[in-house]
Design a protein with these regions (language model features):
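Non-heme Fe(II)/2-oxoglutarate
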Residues: 2-116, 134-137
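Catalytic core of non-heme Fe(II) oxygenases with the double-stranded beta-helix
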Residues: 117-200, 210, 217-218, 228
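Short beta-strand micro-motifs in enzyme catalytic cores
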Residues: 17, 218-222
Length: 245
């Protein structure tokens, strides 16, 4: 039997999904302009400071204003589309039920949530991470159902730093980690940031951002948390009918 006669199908059904897309440059420019404005204003930095709520060893982390996000509907629409995609059949499989461990805001009295009960999603918080040489984000998770990161600026020196790394290069990378190492299975993936790249992943997925050494250059990103909206009344009524039966 020849190699051509042997048809092999690869199945990789396990593990969390990570969605990736590229954001239009004009959206990146709008977000950068807003971040530049905040970074240049000490009072705004103080008013919108978010570092106390985050795990990062980063000097400047601040929330984006609600007023700006209401105007920047293109970014919000992209996030909503990605949230819809995350629970699509071709990503989550054909099962009708989504586990409560995935939808953290689901009622505690239920064990599973069907897609029909999900009515949309809500972006909870959006913040900017202005990272400089030596700054890093230790291994952590987020709150909500989904989280994500969008890269707005990447130091030009990262590529050269990568070339100089002779052992497991990771400068400036983000790494996603789940489970434990096993034969024939990977439990982590590293991604090098590129301007305009946006990643969305389950909020429970551990991840870390590595430091870099390049001086006087910024690695700027936007992070966010999303929850799914659930029709609690419909779920409650239908559960009561099931219980009575």
């Amino acid at each position: 039997m020849t190699d051509k006669q042997i048809k092999i199908e690869t199945l990789l059904p396990f593990g969390p999904a990570i969605l990736k897309t590229s954001i239009p440059s004009y959206v990146v420019d709008n977000l950068n302009a807003h971040c530049d404005e905040t970074l240049a204003d000490e009072q705004k930095l103080k008013d919108y400071d978010y570092s106390g709520q985050l795990a990062g060893n980063v000097k400047k982390e601040f929330k984006l204003s609600g007023e700006f996000l209401n105007k920047e509907q293109n970014f919000s629409n992209i996030l909503r589309k990605l949230a819809e995609r995350m629970i699509a059949v071709d990503v989550r499989g054909t099962e009708e039920q989504l586990g409560v461990s995935y939808l953290r805001n689901a009622p505690p009295s239920t064990t599973n949530i069907a897609r029909e009960y999900i009515t949309g999603c809500q972006v909870l918080t959006v913040w900017c991470v202005s990272q400089w040489g030596g700054d890093f984000n230790p291994l952590h998770i987020h709150s909500g159902d989904l989280s994500g990161v969008l890269y707005l600026k990447v130091p030009e020196g990262l590529e050269e730093e990568y070339k100089n790394e002779d052992h497991h290069p990771a400068v400036g990378d983000i790494e996603f980690i789940t489970g434990v190492p096993q034969a024939f299975s990977r439990n982590s993936i590293k991604v090098s940031p590129k301007v305009g790249d946006l990643y969305v992943f389950p909020a429970w997925l551990h991840h870390t951002a590595y430091p870099f050494r390049t001086k006087d250059q910024e690695r700027r990103s936007i992070s966010f948390n999303i929850i799914y909206n659930i029709d609690q009344e419909k779920l409650k009524n239908e559960k009561m009918l099931v219980d009575k039966e």
